[in-house]
């Protein structure tokens, strides 16, 4: 899941799932000596948890490991892991190339624009008054079509909601249990019909918290902004529910990670919203990509995600109601929705 290096926006870069530093045992890939020095300098200067590392000691260990690829790899992996809380990574040139190829196949335009009628089908266990949308992980392919990919994916999720919104839905389930991360912006825009509670204007639904002022995530009727910067926009107002502001149940689990956790936080604090399931993966922090001198890249963890009320610590997000099995989670979410005034009177 490679984004435009130099992160034409720390915004477009969004959030990455954890990636392993280690290459297959047959061929250990490493940054060049110059890139290794640059990598450590960048971590010491910018990494979110940089104070957790003794940098002189780390450099001494790296120097002592010269000539031993396995030890070099292990030192770099430890430096990145400790300073990022386990969320950062080093990406070799080959890794980036293969990720781009894989993502390109997974997000081909035909797949993005295809009908999602089958994906939007109601679960047999759900009351017909309850709508449901699954927001899964999604990564963009770097290049000039990044914005188009985000627009198309967001429009697809909004269409899933629109196709179910017959006017008879009194509550909705947003299923994030399988959302392993990627790019958060199309996720937030895709579920905007459920996320937003007003028709006009901007709504702050979360933020990135750094040592400086927080950078708010802002939902508009047609797009998403980071502060005042437009990240993705449909060009025209997106879909609006027939009954805006209805109750929403959010499903989470241990696979809900990174951008998936950003999506959880964007919904947390929304009126008439409650979460169910198990705690998330615990990487509710934001990454940007820094290119290194040898063409490889550092996925650098720089900030903590927070909800619309300024709450967030970069760790696991605990649901409001802990349920263990998938069936129990869906049942608890449905029971809560049907007990709300919007459903109880129908």
How would you name each of these model-derived features?
Residues 1-7:
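N-terminal secretory signal peptides that target proteins for export/translocation
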Residues 11-20:
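Bacterial N-terminal signal peptides
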Residues 26-173, 177-178, 345-346:
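Terminal targeting/pro-maturation regions of precursor/exported proteins
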Residues 7-9, 37:
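Hydrophobic alpha-helical segments, especially transmembrane helices
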Residues 29-47, 136-139, 167, 176-346:
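C-terminal "post-core" interaction segments
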Residues 9, 130-131, 273, 298:
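A broad, low-specificity signal marking well-ordered, structured residues that form hydrophobic/aromatic
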